[in-house]
Structure formats: structure tokens, C-alpha cells
Amino acid sequence: RAGKKLLAAKNLMTDPEQAKKFVHLTGVDSLGVAVGTLHGPMKIFKRLPKIDFERLSDIHKKVKIPLVLHGGSGVPVADLKKAAKFGVAVVNIDTELRLAYLAALRWELARQKKEYDPRVIFAPVVKALTVVVEEKLRALQN
């Protein structure tokens, strides 16, 4: 049964030859690829995304344009650094940003119960988001 699930998951990933053909036919300047990451908050609580680096490398060699990693929340920084070496130039991390935002906002609202100025409350929240974004940008620098 596990073998069938693995086979089904592989069928949902980007086929390097199809990616090459798609890029050639459309002339797109970047390509979102399915290489093992997942969208949405549920994945963060169930398992860490596991990037198929062999597939990613093969796609990168064939298409020679920047690649986009959707569902990048929760991907370890070391994996993002490695993915950048295989052409990943954009990583979508919406879920990770939402979680950081809500955690910081809840913390500040609990900590500053009498504060009424949103600028005071939101300054640390923005800082929390900045920390996440800076970490990802550092990981993707070549």
C-alpha cells in the first residue's frame, strides 16, 4: 500500500521532460515546480516537506530558467540553500509568515493589554515577520 502512495506522489511531481517542453512552447521566464513541497498549514503539523533534489536538479538542467518553489513553508533552511543551487529563485512561504504574524500578534496583545495604539502593538509583529523573511533571503543568496 505504501508503494502505491509513493507512486501516486511521484506522478504528481513535475516531469523534467514535460517541463522542458512547456518552457520551450510557452517562453515563460520562470517555472513553478512540484518537487515534494506542500501548500497550506496542515503540512507543518504532519511532516516536513521533503524535496526531491534529483528531480529538481534534472529540471534545472533542462529548463535553464529560474524555478519557483510553492509550499515553501516549513522547508529547512539547509534545504532552501541546496534548492537555490538547483535554480530555485522564488520560495513561497505564506503559511510560515501567517503563523509568525499570529504568534507575534497574540503575544503582544497578551503582553500589552492596556495598549491602544496599533503602531506600538504592531512594531514587534512586523519585526517577527522581518526575521522570517531575512532568514529565507539569506538562505537563497547564491
What is the predicted role of each segment?
Residues 1-63, 77-88, 99, 103-107, ...:
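Alpha/beta enzyme core
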Residues 8-11, 44-48, 69-72, 94, ...:
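Glycine- and other small-residue-rich loops at beta-strand/loop junctions that grip anionic moieties
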Residues 31-33, 67-71, 89-93:
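Hydrophobic faces of well-ordered beta-strands that scaffold small-molecule active sites
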Residues 33, 40, 73, 95, ...:
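Flexible, active-site-adjacent loop/turn segments at secondary-structure boundaries
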Residues 108-142:
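Extended, intrinsically disordered, low-complexity segments
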